[in-house]
Amino acid sequence: MRVLVQRVSQAAVTVDGQTSGEIGAGALLLVGIEESDGPDDIGWLVRKISQLRIFNDEAGVMNRSLIDCGGEALAVSQFTLHASVKKGNRPSYSRAARGEISRPLFDRFVAELSAALGKTVPTGVFGADMRVSLVNDGPVTIWLDSRNPE
């Protein structure tokens, strides 16, 4: 399971001109799920995201987490995070989980992250063509991969 974490001052996702989720200061999470992902991947990512110290403290040092600062999170499913460009120039998405596998895992990820943060995590619309707008803060962008925890 892969998550691209972006620290934002605000973010929103719309589908067909309708806003499905929006946040103020916090983290935009682009979430990609692979065929072999499962509950253990979710647990690791939820702990890491909720406790990741990427928000400034009073001294301007990145020393606070989403939990510490009461920040918000917006989760958007994105199968293209599992693109492979090993052969040719057209990305292959064969490692990305099909909807019947990825949707329940995405929903569980959102539920567990909501519980960890103590607030609802808004989302995009699973499988839809979405427009994501954001204002990067920093910018701070962190790549998390449950199969390669660095």
From Swiss-Prot:
The entry's keywords: Cytoplasm, Hydrolase, RNA-binding, tRNA-binding
Superkingdom of source: Bacteria
GO BP terms in the entry: D-amino acid catabolic process
UniProt GO cellular component terms: cytoplasm
Transmembrane region(s): none
InterPro entries: Daa-tRNA_deacyls_DTD, DTD-like_sf
Annotated compartments: Cytoplasm
Pfam family name, one: Tyr_Deacylase
Molecular function per GO: D-tyrosyl-tRNA(Tyr) deacylase activity; Gly-tRNA(Ala) deacylase activity; Ser(Gly)-tRNA(Ala) hydrolase activity; tRNA binding
EC number from the UniProt entry: 3.1.1.96
Catalytic reaction annotation: glycyl-tRNA(Ala) + H2O = tRNA(Ala) + glycine + H(+); a D-aminoacyl-tRNA + H2O = a tRNA + a D-alpha-amino acid + H(+)
Subunit organization: Homodimer.
Domain notes: A Gly-cisPro motif from one monomer fits into the active site of the other monomer to allow specific chiral rejection of L-amino acids.
Cited function: An aminoacyl-tRNA editing enzyme that deacylates mischarged D-aminoacyl-tRNAs. Also deacylates mischarged glycyl-tRNA(Ala), protecting cells against glycine mischarging by AlaRS. Acts via tRNA-based rather than protein-based catalysis; rejects L-amino acids rather than detecting D-amino acids in the active site. By recycling D-aminoacyl-tRNA to D-amino acids and free tRNA molecules, this enzyme counteracts the toxicity associated with the formation of D-aminoacyl-tRNA entities in vivo and helps enforce protein L-homochirality.
Similarity annotation: Belongs to the DTD family.
Protein's name in the database: D-aminoacyl-tRNA deacylase
Organism: Chromobacterium violaceum (strain ATCC 12472 / DSM 30191 / JCM 1249 / CCUG 213 / NBRC 12614 / NCIMB 9131 / NCTC 9757 / MK)
